[in-house]
């Protein structure tokens, strides 16, 4: 309902990968409908958050009685599966720098606000550190810093701690 939640996973050695940063209205834990009781991911509120919880039995009942709701859940799972597939392909086929650029483009398309109706310009107002972006793209913080600096130097983005202004979306 409110706030942001970071979904992550840690290796036995303590290395963290951020799977998602969720915004108000986004859902997590939906795979519990498949019978998976124990989750390995960690959900942490990164700012004050209001979270609604639905019992799995109630969710099953809603899905059985409401075909539109059932379809919405199916679409949600399909959308998340597609994002995971895209991320996997990115890890396999793209360089670290390309992963950072692709991530910025994805953020702009999903969370960016259009500027004066120009489809090339998007303002992303998310508080993400270089370390957060590194953990979301499976790169190092240094790679994120150098990639963002290169994108800024080439006029593709403007970046500060609170926002990313994408000036040329098609160049990402």
Predicted regions and their residues:
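Polybasic "coupling" helices that flank or enter modular domains
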Residues: 46, 67-136
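Phosphate-/nucleic-acid-contacting segments
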Residues: 109-172
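Structural motif
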Residues: 4, 48-50, 132, 163
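Cyclic-nucleotide recognition modules
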Residues: 20-78, 82
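A short beta-strand-loop-beta hairpin characteristic of the jelly-roll/cupin
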Residues: 5-17
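Glycine- and acidic-residue-biased ligand/ion/polar-headgroup-sensing regions
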Residues: 1-8, 24-25
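A short beta-loop-beta micro-motif enriched in histidine and acidic residues
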Residues: 15-17, 37-39, 121
